[in-house]
Amino acid sequence: MKETLGEMPESNGRRQQGCRLVKKEFVVPFVLVTSLFFVWGFARAILDVLNKHFQMSMDITMTRSAMIQATTYIGYFLMAIPAGVFITRRGYRPGVVLGLLLFGIGSLMFIPGEWLGSFDFFLVSLFVIGCGLVVLETAANPYITELGDPSTAPSRLNLAQSFNGLGCILAPVIVGGILFSNPEASVALPYTVMGVAVLGVAVVFCFVKLPEINSREQIVASAATDAPRGGAGAALRRLVTNKGFMAGVGALFCYEIAEISINTFFINYATDGGWLTPVSYTHLTL
């Protein structure tokens, strides 16, 4: 009995320490990386506002405006694996900086896009933004889990992702209010502001002291240790033949189709039916 009671303070101490969400030395990195979750949530939510705006300002069909979402997510599809390879070789910080640079450049490309009045040029800009966003997500999600005790990693990730939701809420209200309240409003304006802000954040990430949780050598060594015999080809075959994994991929694929389709075209359903104006629709996110 005495032995048990004697162990309790030590056990409780470990439990209290393990329950700390973020280590003290990682608070600043956690705040900076969490801000990225807000950034890409904001950027993705703007797409639904852009869809309706371009239909009105450029007199394009719903089918053609759907290329806004398609082009952005093609960037996700094509850049996902290269992003993982880059981060494995270079580390999390270079991955974040690369993602922010692509995002910022794509946003600033809206300026010449508006001068040219070319919808296709806007699509190229959105493709670059999509490439940047997937690099950001690939770097930030695993990095945020490493900034503290492993037992609290899910809580850290959930907290960071809540700011992603906040970005999704605010983007339609802010950008939709700008674009729909004034027919002559510049679509380049919000993207210019966002591009400058994102490039500023990239500069901060270049100079602020951030812990590189896993060095390049550690990541490569871990990947080599965990990889099955036969290399990448064997790993891919192992995944494809895993029924649970493929079922998960299929479920995510169907979920994304449903989510993106509803978010993209519900504004048309609500406004064309006369129930809401484009401006009042943006307030639904609140």
Describe each region flagged by the PLM:
Residues 2-35:
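Cytosolic juxtamembrane N-terminal segment immediately preceding the first transmembrane helix
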Residues 164-208:
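Helix-loop-helix hairpin linking two adjacent transmembrane segments in secondary transporters
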Residues 70-84:
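Central cavity-lining transmembrane alpha-helices of secondary-active solute carriers
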Residues 47-48, 242-281:
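Extracytoplasmic gate region of multi-pass secondary transporters
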Residues 102-115:
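C-terminal ends and interior cores of transmembrane alpha-helices
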Residues 282-286:
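Conserved small/polar residues in nucleotide/adenosyl-binding loops
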Residues 29, 35-54, 262-267:
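Extracytoplasmic
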